[in-house]
């Protein structure tokens, strides 16, 4: 059952990245940043479950994954940057090409790491 769940999560993550790319190409920068946050949230919750980390807020789970050596320091920093960009888009309506592109670039890099290591 765990394998099926992981495959389902992986497929959602993969589709989420494709959607982020599509939103950026349509110049829907706010929506792309929010979607990046959603994909990050799914990745972090998937890892947290594997690491037996209690489901709390995203920031805390990222920190706990790093402290428990599930993710590297650069990955932790990337996760927090994506989280910050996405949260700003969600709460403040931020919508700019630079942040959307940065979130997408970091997310793509970390999805690649996620796919190869987990």
Where do the model's predicted regions map?
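Charged alpha-helical initiation segments
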Residues: 1-29
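Amphipathic alpha-helical interaction segments
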Residues: 34-38, 42, 60, 84, ...
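Charged, alpha-helical scaffolding/interaction elements associated with membrane systems
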Residues: 25-26, 68, 92
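Amphipathic alpha-helix face/heptad-repeat signature
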Residues: 9, 32-36, 75-78, 103
């Amino acid at each position: 059952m765990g394998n099926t769940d992981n495959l389902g999560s992986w497929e959602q993550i993969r589709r989420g990245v494709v959607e982020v790319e599509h939103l950026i190409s349509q110049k829907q920068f706010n929506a792309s940043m929010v979607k990046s946050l959603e994909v990050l949230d799914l990745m972090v919750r998937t890892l947290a479950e594997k690491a037996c980390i209690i489901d709390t807020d995203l920031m805390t789970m990222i920190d706990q994954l790093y402290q428990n050596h599930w993710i590297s320091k650069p990955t932790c920093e990337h996760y927090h940057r994506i989280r910050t960009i996405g949260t700003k888009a969600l709460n403040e309506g931020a919508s700019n090409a630079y942040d959307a592109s940065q979130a997408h670039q970091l997310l793509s890099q970390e999805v690649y790491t996620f796919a190869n290591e987990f």
